[in-house]
């Protein structure tokens, strides 16, 4: 009697979920084969554990109809770089994630959603053929290199929760970008927001220290008049004077809202002699082309009919009335204008004068 030997078992290097079904395989290609899903029918791919090799990355770009891709590098999943060692860096010299180009007859490729956890650095060339992607989650990236996302023509949502450094031109050309999450950023590089036409609302965290000439106001189409910026830092960052040029117009001024109690520090960058406890001139609250607002305060405007250059402003804690000393300061500072323009009698709750006098 002979003894039947068992068939040799395929070595498992990767576990992946393909169109909702989890499979093991010696490689990404073998895992797709075992799933029973034809390669041109794969629309969703999550790599759960194992090792992603250069061969796997080369195969990835052959999945022509892929729409969603997720990979979370960490204890259970390694990304093997070009040098054969594990890496958390995407660049043309370490590891490149490249997707399939658009199919013949299509206006764009199929990929729309990308999640890459555990990646700590991304540089130009680290992602390829990603221009069709609408949503990118890279929550662990700390360093974003120059022009890293410059080809994101369809990119609408970008999560860079842990990023500290944003390189020059990092988002240049992301004209559809509407939502950008940066909870730890310290430096924004030159040109990083050029041609981000749809991004008219931005929150910068308490960690922000340096804003270079990011060219936030430069658009290919339209403009960002009326943009709303929020800065959570109580200490004002260093800002290049041209960083927000072009975001404000006479009728639609762009604003920057700062934390309660931080207004004086921001105004001091503009005019060290200005006193936020009193009435301020228009130029005093123009912080790098953005008009200052303070969390927890309301801005009371004194509209001068002789021109916006003569407008004056007071910040009043929300729910409180304007104090007599601020009114006195207004009349003292605006004496000349009051004599020249009889319409300027005092404060009114409406710009056209039809409201109540304060």
Q: Would you name each region that the model predicts?
A:
Residues 125-126, 145-148, 167-170, 189-192, ...:
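Consensus positions within tandem repeat domains that build extended binding/scaffold surfaces
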Residues 56-65, 226, 354-358:
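Short, surface-exposed polybasic-and-hydrophobic patches located at secondary-structure transitions
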Residues 45, 57-60, 202, 229, ...:
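Extracellular/surface recognition and adhesion modules
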Residues 2, 7, 213-295:
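Leucine-rich solenoid repeat scaffolds
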Residues 1-8, 293-358:
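Secondary-structure capping and domain/repeat boundary segments
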Residues 17-41:
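Acidic Gly/Asp/Thr-rich repetitive segments characteristic of extracellular carbohydrate-active
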Residues 59-62, 82-91, 99, 104-106, ...:
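A structural signal for leucine-rich repeat
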Residues 12-22, 43-52, 65-93, 108-121, ...:
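Structural signature of tandem-repeat unit edges
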């Amino acid at each position: 009697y002979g003894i039947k030997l068992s068939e040799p078992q395929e070595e498992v290097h990767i576990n992946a979920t393909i169109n909702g079904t989890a499979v093991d395989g010696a490689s990404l290609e073998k895992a797709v084969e075992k799933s029973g899903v034809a390669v041109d029918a794969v629309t969703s791919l999550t790599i759960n554990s194992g090792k992603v090799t250069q061969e796997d990355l080369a195969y990835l770009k052959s999945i022509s109809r892929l729409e969603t891709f997720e990979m979370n590098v960490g204890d259970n999943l390694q990304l093997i770089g070009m040098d054969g060692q594990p890496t958390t860096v995407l660049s043309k010299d370490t590891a490149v994630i490249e997707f399939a180009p658009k199919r013949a007859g299509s206006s764009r490729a199929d990929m729309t959603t990308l999640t890459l956890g555990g990646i700590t650095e991304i540089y130009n060339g680290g992602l390829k053929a990603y221009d069709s992607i609408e949503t990118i989650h890279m929550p662990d990236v700390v360093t974003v290199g120059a022009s890293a996302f410059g080809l994101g023509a369809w990119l609408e949502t970008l999560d860079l929760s842990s990023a500290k450094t944003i390189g020059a031109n990092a988002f240049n050309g992301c004209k559809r970008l509407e939502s950008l999450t940066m909870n730890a950023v310290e430096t924004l590089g030159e040109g990083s927001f050029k041609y981000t036409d749809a991004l008219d609302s931005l929150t910068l965290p308490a960690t922000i220290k340096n804003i270079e000439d990011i060219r936030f106001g430069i658009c290919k189409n339209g403009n960002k008049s009326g943009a709303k910026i929020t800065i959570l830092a109580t200490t004002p960052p260093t800002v290049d004077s041209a960083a927000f040029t072009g975001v404000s117009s006479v009728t639609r001024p762009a604003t920057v809202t700062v934390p309660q109690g931080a207004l004086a520090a921001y105004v001091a960058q503009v005019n060290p002699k200005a006193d936020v406890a009193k009435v301020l001139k228009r130029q005093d609250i123009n912080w790098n082309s953005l008009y200052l607002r303070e969390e927890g305060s309301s801005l009371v405007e004194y509209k001068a009919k002789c021109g916006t250059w003569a407008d004056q402003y007071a910040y009043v804690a929300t729910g409180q009335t304007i104090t007599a000393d601020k009114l006195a300061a207004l009349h003292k500072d605006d004496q000349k204008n009051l004599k020249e323009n009889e319409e300027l009698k005092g404060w009114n709750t409406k710009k056209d004068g039809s409201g109540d006098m304060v």
